[in-house]
């Protein structure tokens, strides 16, 4: 709930942070890695005219190209070596996770612990290279079909672009893993977060420029700012929201001692699937455009027609976007949370839900509650992701942040702050244990 977020903020101790040497090293490592990433977004791919490319990006700033460029921190607009960002890795991760539910081999690897996880991660890396190479080739062919952007079109440009962009994605994948292991927070999420936030000053500058020139009134600008803050507060509230199921454990007798009955809760997050559904839905909707780039606009008429209908902000795009978000919210929740396994574990340790028979009935009840919670979470995701699209397309109100970007920024911020708080608590416990041991030794 929102109170949990307030509690987290109130307990954040900046004095303890200043004394936490290990945590400060992790934070400095994370900042250094993100600086390297940002520098890479300014190293251009050879063979591209930056002036013509900037013109193309400006013409498509409110379309699909602008949306991808925003997630990449402007790297795509500069055709930098990190133009693909980490998106191929995310797509590969999602595909592997979805395949785990239908592939017996991957399902078995998932149950093998650390070794199985390493194998699955290796498959994800292979998938990342394949997807990055395909997307890089699609971009190179698409640029060649856009006039004078490519200085020397041909196979040499295509191959060099594929190698450069794929190498950039692989490096970002490695950098994200290093941040996760040696820094603070989830490395992949922080890379996307930094790319989105890096363009925030430009977006705010463009908004206030519209106000200065009189294209937007002061009241409209104030409404956009207040509305954005309200959406952020709404995201924080929902991301913290839980449906708690009461779990009871019977009295236990150990020797002559009888332990009292215990109570606990099984928390079901309102948004169990996180930001995965909108990201994967966007990836699927980008597929026709990628295929169209391969054909350089000379493909069949039906493909060009579908590509036009799926343009950013088109009614069909919005309708399919909502449908895919809802579908993947349910699908991914089913992968992340298994009611049968949860019911079996409760029965194994003697836990039960009051009024519900342990075993199959408990699994059915958990699935019943989870389905309704997921429905609310799916509608929440669809609302947040489509609201900026709807206001931009039909009301003419400019929004710098898309709904997916807002979800990523807020979720990553909350997770990173929670991890920092966890490190501070662990340090305080270590100091408390040391003091207790010293007092015991003195006695």
Show where each model-derived region lies.
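N-terminal cationic and glycine-rich segments that engage phosphates or anionic surfaces
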Residues: 2-110, 115-443
């Amino acid at each position: 709930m929102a109170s949990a977020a307030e509690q987290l903020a109130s307990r954040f101790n900046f004095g303890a942070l200043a004394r936490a040497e290990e945590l400060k090293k992790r934070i400095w490592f994370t900042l250094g890695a993100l600086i390297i990433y940002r520098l890479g977004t300014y190293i251009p791919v050879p063979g591209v005219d930056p002036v013509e490319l900037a013109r193309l990006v400006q013409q498509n700033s409110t379309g699909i190209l602008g949306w991808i460029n925003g997630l990449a921190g402007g790297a795509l607009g500069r055709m930098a070596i990190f133009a693909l960002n980490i998106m191929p890795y995310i797509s590969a991760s999602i595909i592997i996770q979805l395949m785990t539910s239908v592939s017996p081999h991957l399902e078995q690897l998932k149950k093998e612990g650390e070794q199985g996880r390493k194998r699955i991660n290796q498959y994800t890396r292979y998938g990342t290279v394949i997807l990055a190479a395909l997307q890089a080739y699609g971009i190179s062919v698409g640029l060649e079909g856009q006039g004078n952007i490519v200085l020397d079109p041909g196979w040499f440009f295509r191959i060099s672009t594929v190698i450069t962009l794929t190498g950039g994605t692989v490096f970002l994948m490695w950098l994200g893993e290093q941040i996760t292991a040696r820094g603070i927070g989830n490395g992949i999420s922080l890379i996307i977060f930094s790319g989105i936030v890096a363009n925030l000053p430009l977006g705010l500058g463009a908004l206030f420029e519209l106000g200065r020139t009189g294209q937007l009134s002061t009241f409209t600008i104030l409404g956009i700012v207040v509305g954005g803050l309200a959406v952020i507060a709404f995201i924080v509230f929902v991301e913290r929201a839980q449906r708690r199921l009461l779990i009871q454990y019977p009295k236990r007798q150990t020797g002559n001692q009888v332990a009292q009955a215990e109570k606990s809760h099984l928390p079901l997050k309102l948004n169990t699937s996180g930001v995965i559904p909108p990201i994967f839905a966007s990836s699927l909707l980008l597929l026709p455009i990628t295929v169209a780039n391969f054909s350089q606009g000379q493909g069949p008429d039906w493909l060009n027609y579908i590509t036009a209908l799926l343009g950013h902000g088109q009614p069909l795009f919005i309708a399919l976007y909502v449908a895919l978000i809802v579908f993947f919210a349910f699908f991914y929740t089913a992968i992340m949370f298994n009611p049968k396994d949860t019911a079996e574990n409760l029965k194994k340790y003697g836990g039960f839900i009051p009024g519900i028979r342990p075993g199959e009935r408990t699994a059915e009840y958990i699935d019943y509650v989870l389905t309704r919670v997921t429905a609310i979470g799916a509608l929440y995701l669809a609302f947040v992701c489509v609201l900026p699209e709807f206001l931009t397309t039909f009301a003419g109100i400019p929004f710098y942040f898309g709904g997916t970007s807002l979800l990523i920024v807020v979720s990553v911020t909350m997770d990173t702050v929670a991890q920092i708080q966890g490190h501070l608590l662990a340090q305080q416990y270590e100091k408390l244990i040391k003091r207790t041991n010293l007092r015991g030794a003195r006695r």
